[in-house]
């Protein structure tokens, strides 16, 4: 297992080498607080929060965790938002209109929440309440923004789905690499290839082994680790910790909708999941 001074300091504050994956839309600070109080690392997804909402959540985390010396993670995206094509938007709305009428959903779909990349306005808020850990998805922010985050003492983590991405993260200032295997239910974190080809994506066990041979940073295993045996195997294979998301969806502190809770409770213990190009999160 690899260690860095910043990771070793964080690990010493955790009872369990377990990170709750940030899951935008199905959780807020309530779940993060519960996880950190239980001895693992709770995470707050911030990609869908504006500056005011982020400040409220950071106040909660500082009050409920920071003042007690408990660590927590705040997660941001580093993607480039797509440009909206008004004609294509109108075309797909028109194509789906008959189905919305058939199922009594109304004529217009509600606009989806916008996931914003990490930017200066959010960094200004974060600087007032520096979290122990800041994690990123889809790479890292610009060098000036990353320097600000590291300057106030936060440990920086980011996801890699390939060796190439892990090497890039190591070269550009990450303290910890999250090895996101193909089994992961969240957004695919790939960021170096424009085509987002899934053929080169590996299961977490294979990816963990490749990253251990290629980079010197601590590596967190992520993807399909929903059982104690899988967690144990990842740790025995050298992972510094594991990151788990789906397994937390049935917690009472999660905001998982009732229909999704029912589906999870009805699901078979083992089922096949097939990644798709059109959507990268379950």
Language model regions located:
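Active-site entrance/lid segments in N-terminal catalytic domains of soluble metabolic enzymes
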Residues: 1-214
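Conserved active-site-proximal phosphate/metal-binding subdomains
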Residues: 97-99, 187-220, 225-282
């Amino acid at each position: 297992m690899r260690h860095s001074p910043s990771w070793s300091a964080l690990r010493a504050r955790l009872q369990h080498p377990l990170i709750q994956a940030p899951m935008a839309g199905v959780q807020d600070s309530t779940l993060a607080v519960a996880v950190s109080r239980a001895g693992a690392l709770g995470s707050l997804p911030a990609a869908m929060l504006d500056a005011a909402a982020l400040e409220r959540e950071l106040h909660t985390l500082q009050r409920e965790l920071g003042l007690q010396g408990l660590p927590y993670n705040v997660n941001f995206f580093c993607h480039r938002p797509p440009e909206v094509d008004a004609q294509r938007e109108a075309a797909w709305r028109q194509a789906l209109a008959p189905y919305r009428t058939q199922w009594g959903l109304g004529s217009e779909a509600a606009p989806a929440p916008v996931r914003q990349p990490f930017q200066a306005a959010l960094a200004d808020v974060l600087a007032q309440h520096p979290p122990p850990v800041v994690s990123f998805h889809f790479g890292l922010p610009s060098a000036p923004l990353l320097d600000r985050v590291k300057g106030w003492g936060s440990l920086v983590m980011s996801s890699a789905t390939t060796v190439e991405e892990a090497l890039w993260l190591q070269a550009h200032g990450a303290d910890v690499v999250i090895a996101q295997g193909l089994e992961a239910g969240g957004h695919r974190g790939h960021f170096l290839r424009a085509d987002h080809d899934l053929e080169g994506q590996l299961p977490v066990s294979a990816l963990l082994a490749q990253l251990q041979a290629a980079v010197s940073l601590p590596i967190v295993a992520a993807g399909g680790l929903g059982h104690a045996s899988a967690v144990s195997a990842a740790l025995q294979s050298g992972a510094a910790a594991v990151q788990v998301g789906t397994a937390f969806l049935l917690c009472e502190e999660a905001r998982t909708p009732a229909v999704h809770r029912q589906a999870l409770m009805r699901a078979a213990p083992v089922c096949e999941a097939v990644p798709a190009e059109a959507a990268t999160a379950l």
